[in-house]
Design a protein with these regions (language model features):
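A short, Trp-centered hydrophobic/proline-enriched beta-strand micro-motif
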Residues: 43-47
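Cysteine-nucleophile protease catalytic domains, especially the papain-like/related folds used
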Residues: 1-42, 128-135
Length: 135
């Protein structure tokens, strides 16, 4: 999901001549995200609703799916099962308190919330470490 958000945000901000920078931080260590927050760069981060465990759920099958190879040829058609992450949710990570081991986030479902830092990190990792910043 993050690459699509990054691409769309870059196009929009360029059209607005905003000068803002968009970075895809997917794969970043959680501690690196905290450093961004400490630098006054809130981070959009994928985790799960109410920090429940993520489940991969079968969604549908693409029949006769082919990929285009680097030489322009296509792969042998195959059936591709597509899964999605149940209970996935995006938060805006905007602060943290190491003494209390909590993160402070804006949550579109619950408003400003504090969550246990270790659990939040686990959920971030379950969602393939997806994160985006705009500054």
């Amino acid at each position: 999901y993050a690459p699509v958000i990054v691409d769309t945000a870059r196009k929009y901000l360029a059209a607005q001549n905003s000068g803002r920078i968009v970075k895809d931080l997917t794969g970043a260590k959680f501690e690196d995200l905290l450093r961004e927050v400490a630098s006054n760069h809130p981070v959009a981060i994928w985790a799960s609703i109410d920090l429940v465990d993520i489940q991969e759920v079968y969604a549908y099958t693409i029949y006769n799916y082919t990929e285009t190879n680097s030489d322009g040829s296509t792969s042998t058609p195959k059936n591709l099962d597509v899964y999605w992450l149940e209970n996935e949710h995006v938060y805006l990570l905007k602060g943290y308190d190491l003494d209390r081991n909590v993160v402070i986030v804006n949550d579109s479902l619950n408003g400003e919330m504090e969550y246990d830092m270790n659990r939040f990190k686990e959920c971030y990792e379950q969602c393939y470490k997806q994160a985006v910043i705009i500054y």
